[in-house]
Amino acid sequence: MEFDTIAAISTPIGTGGIGIIRISGQNSIEVAGKIIKSKRFNSIYDIPVRYAALVEVYDNDEFIDQAILIKFKAPHSYTGEDVVEIQSHGGMVVLRRILEVVIKNGARHAMPGEFTKRAFLNGRLDLSQAEAIIDIINSKTELLQKNAAKQLKGVLSKKIDEIAEILLNLISSIEASIDFSEHEVDEISPQEIEKSIDTALEMIYRLLKTYETGRAIKSGIYTVIVGRPNVGKSSLLNRLLKEERSIVTDIPGTTRDVIEEVLDIEGIPIILVDTAGVRQTEDIVERIGVERTLKSVERADLVIFMIESDGITKEDIEIFSSIKNKKYIILVNKTDKGINISQDEIKKLFGKEGIFISIAKDENLELVEKAIKEAILEQNIEGFDEVLITNLRHKELLLKAKGFLTSAKQNLYSFPLDILSIDLKNALDSIYQITGKNVTEDMVDRIFSMFCIGK
């Protein structure tokens, strides 16, 4: 496919040692040739492909900067088009000046994600691989980066292609049975159809099962610490973060607002939320803090419910009523001051056992991180070689395919084959959309609009 010539700064905004201007399109080499001079090469066309050439960049006769120029010929480039990269010094003024000169000589400003969009449209990568690039760029933890790298490598694409192959073969066999029913063609049996559907459903189920874990490593787990005033919520936040982020005093009600910080637990971003202690109060500011606490609980993925080891109070029971429908763990703090509560009592009132800790003495705090991890992960990801589904679009398309296949299986013995094939084709269409083999232009535009300019 041929497009016009686009250009953008591909490195982050700011000061750095090197900045890169990327040019792509059928006239990219011609455009770059108008603004550079080389002491070694007479023209840009004399510079070998993939050779790092020292050049000088000019605006007409005005010298702008020295740079390294690398050119790539289609289809062997990131976009699949002719591409030129100009690596200049990294100041924003010089980068913007070079970009302006490139635009003045025949290119246009690239839209967000347009380079990767062209790579997709030119068959350099599929849609799921393109989406993996966003995750690699935005990775906040090593775990997400590793998973995104697997997706970029094509691990997810391979699994999707395997499901598609099963469905495509099944549809072909059914249509052959319909079209050549009067000839000597073996008709596919309902049992064979059911076996293929079950195989595809099992593969889809295994992928869907990874989504909650995938979502956790991508978006983070919103984890709210709740309890009555002075139970140790702020101290817990500070200990987990290993820094003094929240103010800690012996005065109940010190924390009056919601404080959020991110904790990395073995590659999973945990958004820790310290909240105001929940109690009846006449203090207007503290009351607002309590209201914000309850709102934080509503959106929580996980709640850390803290009580004290000297006994369960009426306030504890009232607080628990607001979190009992959430995923939660129970911490029993201040064991250094004595324990007047049993696991049986905790389990009877709150539905599960608690973890006894002493923040003041740093006792059993390693169990807290372990409990958080166990509460949020659907599976053990240590040594996990499979790719995790992290993208909601992929999950929704897999669910659609699952629904169509389930419908086909339910109707297998009561509907004719031509009706059955409609559900199978719809399932295949949903599967194809994951890798972009059958996707609307609007969806493509929406996906690539999430990229930054220059990628």
Curated annotation (Swiss-Prot):
SUPFAM superfamilies: P-loop containing nucleoside triphosphate hydrolases. GTP binds at residues 230-235, 249-255, 274-277. GO terms for molecular function: GTP binding; GTPase activity; metal ion binding. (6S)-5-formyl-5,6,7,8-tetrahydrofolate binds at R22, E85, R124, K455. Coiled coil: none annotated. GO terms for cellular component: cytosol. It is found in: Cytoplasm. Gene3D superfamilies: P-loop containing nucleotide triphosphate hydrolases (3.40.50.300), Probable tRNA modification gtpase trme, domain 1 (3.30.1360.120), tRNA modification GTPase MnmE domain 2 (1.20.120.430). Its cofactor is K(+). It comes from the Bacteria. Exhibits a very high intrinsic GTPase hydrolysis rate. Involved in the addition of a carboxymethylaminomethyl (cmnm) group at the wobble position (U34) of certain tRNAs, forming tRNA-cmnm(5)s(2)U34. This is tRNA modification GTPase MnmE.
